[in-house]
Amino acid sequence: FIAVHEHSRFKTPQFELSQEFADKLYLKHKTFVGSISRLETFAKCPLKHFIRYGLYLKENQDWQDIRIRGTILHHILETLTLKYKKDYVKVNVEQIHEVIENEFQFAKMIFPNKEKWIDAQIQELQAKTELILEQLAYFEKNWHMNIFKQEQKFSYSIPWHDMTIELYGYIDRIDTSKTSFCIFDYKSSDKDLRVADFENGTSLQLATYTIAAQAQNNLIPTGSFYISLKSAPVLHKPLSLNYRKKIPESTRIEIKETLDTFTQQKKLKGWAYQDITTYCDKDNLFTTKKESPSFEELRHKHTEIVTNLTEDILSGNIRPDHDTNACDYCAYR
């Protein structure tokens, strides 16, 4: 560290790499290889991208990290659906416990001194899984595509100038009919898909998965949606009180109103590219937006966004230009 006593001698740090150095750092045989989360990281903060993917500094792993819990929960659902197909939402308590117990067997062997803590995690995940399956039962009952693939590996190439952009990753779930398919991505929160987030590069996953799956399977894309694994309960208030009158009045709230609120909150959020109601018994499974792009618009815009982000990366940009509050939970802060 250098103590600077005169402001006239201070220079603002230049957060940039030379283009030559950036090429050596990020390119291999004229190919830029990256995951979707990598591009999203750069869109959110170029400096974090440089630290993570240029310097290869990884953040410490914490068992209590909510992202790790989400990954475990995701894998539990994947195991259940592989074993029981669409009937995974009908499994009993013992079947759920067996799957979760198997997930933690290795951890118990490696960390015998943490067995009680691990058992507590199993119980917590058991309760959470049961609640999630109850919530997903309504969707699976009224949704009539079949689960085709889970954790499907993909790679997608975009020719650009005299080089290639190679994107790769895993698609959580692909459902299909004879002619069409739909993409689902599991999330631990109530994530929504917004056009603004897609256009600024911070929400590219569903779009990329859809484009890659269409290229691989040559089926018609009907939509791409998030499946929320958040299991927060909806509070039922038996009465609504009006204090604006001299004598407060109460109005009874029927349980059906609360159930309708719950169903509304559990709609899957995302974009539809075709009339998705063809594959539904109910019209309240999905939340779709009027401004959702068509698939052709999506593909064209996606190529433009990805190439712009790649160009910015290779230009040497490592500035700390980040989203609001992005530093609050950043491992590199």
Question: Which functions belong to the PLM regions below?
Answer:
Residues 1-79, 262-275, 279-282, 302-316, ...:
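C-terminal, charged and often intrinsically disordered regions of DNA end-processing helicases
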Residues 7-8, 14, 47-48, 144-148, ...:
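Beta-sheet entry/capping signal
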Residues 29-32, 49-58, 74-78, 102-113, ...:
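Short acidic (Asp/Glu) and glycine-rich catalytic loops that position anionic groups and cofactors
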Residues 31, 38-47, 65-72, 92, ...:
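Secondary-structure capping and boundary motifs in well-ordered enzyme cores
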Residues 60-64, 116-124, 157-165, 191-204, ...:
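Short, contiguous acidic/charged loop-to-helix segments that flank catalytic cores in large enzymes
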Residues 75-153, 157, 287-288, 296-299, ...:
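A non-catalytic, helix-rich entry segment at domain boundaries
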Residues 91, 212-333:
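Metal-dependent nuclease catalytic regions and adjoining charged, substrate-binding loops involved
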Residues 145-216, 229:
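Non-catalytic protein-protein interaction segments used by genome-maintenance enzymes to assemble
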